[in-house]
């Protein structure tokens, strides 16, 4: 029997784009990358675990900020090359800037305009971690 992970069309780097959406509102919270291990762990632990390309290691969402993403549903697109995680965003903040969503800028009159408020100062979110999160 074919492993469910084998059905995914991983890119040349062995990664797949992963979009996190609020399971109640449908709002897109963020996009990150997953390798095979990250996706397998996400499914088994029922929480979002991504692959940090900049750090070259697993990134357990919320491990520093406390803003864990609890998995409610996992979806695969028609080309099997993008996954969507329907999540409960603990703390209501997905972005390292302290906003609900990483998509807080809108294109308006030829420029990017910030429209979402900072819900919590990033320095306060990461003060115990001792460094800035990606």
Curated annotation (Swiss-Prot):
Pathway note: Amino-acid biosynthesis; L-histidine biosynthesis; L-histidine from 5-phospho-alpha-D-ribose 1-diphosphate: step 3/9
Entry's transmembrane regions: none
Pfam families noted in UniProt: PRA-CH
Catalytic activity: 1-(5-phospho-beta-D-ribosyl)-5'-AMP + H2O = 1-(5-phospho-beta-D-ribosyl)-5-[(5-phospho-beta-D-ribosylamino)methylideneamino]imidazole-4-carboxamide
Cofactor annotation comment: Binds 1 Mg(2+) ion per subunit. Binds 1 zinc ion per subunit.
Function: Catalyzes the hydrolysis of the adenine ring of phosphoribosyl-AMP.
Family membership noted in the UniProt record: Belongs to the PRA-CH family.
Protein name: Phosphoribosyl-AMP cyclohydrolase
């Amino acid at each position: 029997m074919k492993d469910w992970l084998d059905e995914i069309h991983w890119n040349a780097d062995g990664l797949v784009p992963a979009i996190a959406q609020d399971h109640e509102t449908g709002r897109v919270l963020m996009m990150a990358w997953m390798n095979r291990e990250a996706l397998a762990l996400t499914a088994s632990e029922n929480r979002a675990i991504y692959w940090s390309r900049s750090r070259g290691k697993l990134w357990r969402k919320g491990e520093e900020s406390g803003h864990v993403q609890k998995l409610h549903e996992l979806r695969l697109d028609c080309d099997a090359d993008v996954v969507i995680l329907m999540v409960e965003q603990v703390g209501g903040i997905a972005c390292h800037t302290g906003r609900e969503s990483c998509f807080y800028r809108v294109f308006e009159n030829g420029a990017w305009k910030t429209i979402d408020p900072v819900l919590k100062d990033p320095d306060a979110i990461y003060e115990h971690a001792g460094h800035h999160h990606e």
